[in-house]
Amino acid sequence: MNMAKMIKVKQTKSAIGRLPKHKATLTGLGLRRIGHVRELEDTPSVRGMINRVFYMVEVVEE
């Protein structure tokens, strides 16, 4: 069984007053509110999304 590497991403700051592109990126990551944690596949596209909103999220677990 080929298991993809997963990472956990947690939203640490609010999206209120942020750039619309950054709000859309949070939505694309599946994050809705402060403290929300999602487990996502570790791909270059997901890493790029995390880098775009680095000031609002943290990688909890790799």
Curated annotation (Swiss-Prot):
Question: What Pfam family is a match for this entry?
Answer: Ribosomal_L30
**Keywords, A to Z?**
Ribonucleoprotein, Ribosomal protein
Q: Which CDD domains match?
A: Ribosomal_L30
One Gene Ontology BP term is: translation
For this protein, the record's InterPro entries field holds:
Ribo_uL30_ferredoxin-like_sf, Ribosomal_uL30_bac-type, Ribosomal_uL30_CS, Ribosomal_uL30_ferredoxin-like
GO MF, one term, reads: structural constituent of ribosome
Gene3D superfamilies attached here?
Ribosomal protein L30, ferredoxin-like fold domain
Q: Which GO terms describe its cellular component?
A: cytosolic large ribosomal subunit
- What HAMAP family would the database entry show? Ribosomal_uL30_B (MF_01371_B)
Question: Quaternary structure?
Answer: Part of the 50S ribosomal subunit.
The record, for PANTHER family, names:
LARGE RIBOSOMAL SUBUNIT PROTEIN UL30M (PTHR15892:SF2), MITOCHONDRIAL RIBOSOMAL PROTEIN L30 (PTHR15892)
**Protein family (similarity comment):** Belongs to the universal ribosomal protein uL30 family.
By what name is this protein known? Large ribosomal subunit protein uL30
Per the UniProt entry, what species is this protein from, by scientific name? Pseudoalteromonas atlantica (strain T6c / ATCC BAA-1087)
